[in-house]
Amino acid sequence: MLHVITVHLKSKIPSDIPGQVIDPVKGIWRTADGWAEGSFLSSMKRMSQALEVRRLIDQILEDDPDARIVVAGDFNAEPEEVPVLAICGNVEDTNNGALAARVLVPIEHSIPNEARYTHFHHGRGRMIDHMLVTRNLLAHYRGSEIHNEILHDDSLAFATDTKYPESDHAPVVATFDFD
């Protein structure tokens, strides 16, 4: 059996704070502390979603220590950010070697650095869409690709431009061989 968990964690766009947003389309805030509070709430929402995913992974592994698990989707966080790290459960973060079998591995590490991005914002490629797998799936892993060839910058200039109807995220595709 293969467990597939899809995620779409809260974006980094600040959460609405009543009375603080002047123009929600342009992201104009009345005060800096209103923007900071909205950003804080967004990060808390994203982290609480990541925590629930990690709890689900741990429950699956508690029931079946050999479970094959894939967690994939829009994490709205880069590899070194806490939501991704929390879902991975790295031994370096928990300081508990007994949890090594529960670590999830990001498959994007096999993709060259210059091609390792799924989102383009203000001229910078960012890896915010991930596919994480349990270690027992690595023996079946054959490779992955990120199809970011036609990815446009999602800055405000492109956000409302109807000439760019496709997603602002590139798909991550992985191949596994279970024969």
Question: What function would you assign to each model-found segment?
Answer:
Residues 13-16, 140-141:
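Short, solvent-exposed loop/turn elements at domain surfaces
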Residues 10-12, 26, 45, 163:
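Context-gated lysine
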Residues 15-43:
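A solvent-exposed, charged loop/short amphipathic helix patch at secondary-structure junctions
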Residues 1-14:
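Structured beta-strand-rich core segments of catalytic domains in phosphoester-bond hydrolases
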Residues 55-70, 75-179:
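Metal-dependent phosphoester-hydrolase catalytic domains
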Residues 36-65:
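A long, amphipathic alpha-helix that forms part
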